Amino acid sequence: MLVLGIETSCDETGVALYDTCQGLLGHTLYSQVDMHREYGGVVPELASRDHIRRILPLIRQLFRQSDTSLESVDAIACTQGPGLAGALLTGASFSSALAFARNIPVLNIHHLEGHLLSPLLSDPAPDFPFVALLVSGGHTQLMRVDGIGQYRLLGETVDDAAGEAFDKTAKLLDLDYPGGKLLAELATQGRAEQFRLPRPMLNSNDLNFSFSGLKTAAALLIGKHEMNSQTRADIAFAFEDAVTDVLVKKSVTALNITGLQQLVVAGGVGANSRLRQKLLHHLSGTDITVFFPALEFCTDNGAMIALAGALRLQQLDERLRAGGSFTVKARWNLEDL
């Protein structure tokens, strides 16, 4: 069965084709980063309008590159939420209309489920069950994943998400948009011994996170020093070091509590090289295996949505619906699946 995946939850338009026998046939992605840069962040109305412009040309490009056609598609999987309501409506309405015209079903996919399952696009892939660290601009969660749709929250941020803290601290350092990625690049030039920032909730008796206070501590540190290129790099290093220390410690604790021996790291911050290095170093010599998505699948993309749709299609998922009607969920708890 061939599934067309469509992702429009924020500022990337992603489409992909996933075959239940052959795997991923192809995917195309358009990022709106350049458009939003002058505003210093995502403008929801502009994001929605750009999805409308991009989605059909991207699908045509996808079919050409994959040497297939719409007539071969058995179902469409689209992101139903969470995300920006207008952006979600663009993908959902397009998916529903296309499915109605072709008389094929639509699967509503949770955006975070797509991220959780994205390492399954790579080889080797994890087996169920596993612990997942889902870390992005909007979410920081530890989940126990026992199967498709079987997700249990172990811990989450009580305030800012890790990616959000990266972006906000990047603004304090006068970095351009997207700030989190630029902060990580700047941190590679920083010196480890110059500054140390707190590790919030590092030793708490739960698996929750907090990054708001760390951002405030970084702001106070920036205010105390005259900024030059080296000082900015040193502070970036200290900030990234603190965030990744917390993420690693909590992930290892989750593995110890659950007794599971597989860790999946997913979401945009999962591309962070220092986080990857620390996890691999900390877990080397143990029986625990860490799985990272390919870098192209860390950001929002259609491939993870097509994959999630294909897996649910194989299970004859109850959310399978006919084209012609649709709803979106700007807020949606992953445990409610």
UniProtKB/Swiss-Prot annotation:
Database matches in InterPro entries: ATPase_NBD (IPR043129), Gcp-like_dom (IPR000905), KAE1/TsaD (IPR017861), TsaD (IPR022450)
Superkingdom as given in the UniProt entry: Bacteria
The protein's location, in the record's own words, is: Cytoplasm
Matches recorded under CDD domains: ASKHA_NBD_TsaD_bac
Listed binding positions for substrate are: L134, V135, S136, G137, G138, D167, G180, N272
Q: Which UniProt keywords apply?
A: Acyltransferase, Cytoplasm, Iron, Metal-binding, Transferase, tRNA processing
Q: What does this protein do?
A: Required for the formation of a threonylcarbamoyl group on adenosine at position 37 (t(6)A37) in tRNAs that read codons beginning with adenine. Is involved in the transfer of the threonylcarbamoyl moiety of threonylcarbamoyl-AMP (TC-AMP) to the N6 group of A37, together with TsaE and TsaB. TsaD likely plays a direct catalytic role in this reaction.
Give the protein name, as stated in the record.
Answer: tRNA N6-adenosine threonylcarbamoyltransferase
Source organism per UniProt: Nitrosomonas europaea (strain ATCC 19718 / CIP 103999 / KCTC 2705 / NBRC 14298)
Its ancestry begins with: Bacteria, Pseudomonadati, Pseudomonadota, Betaproteobacteria, Nitrosomonadales
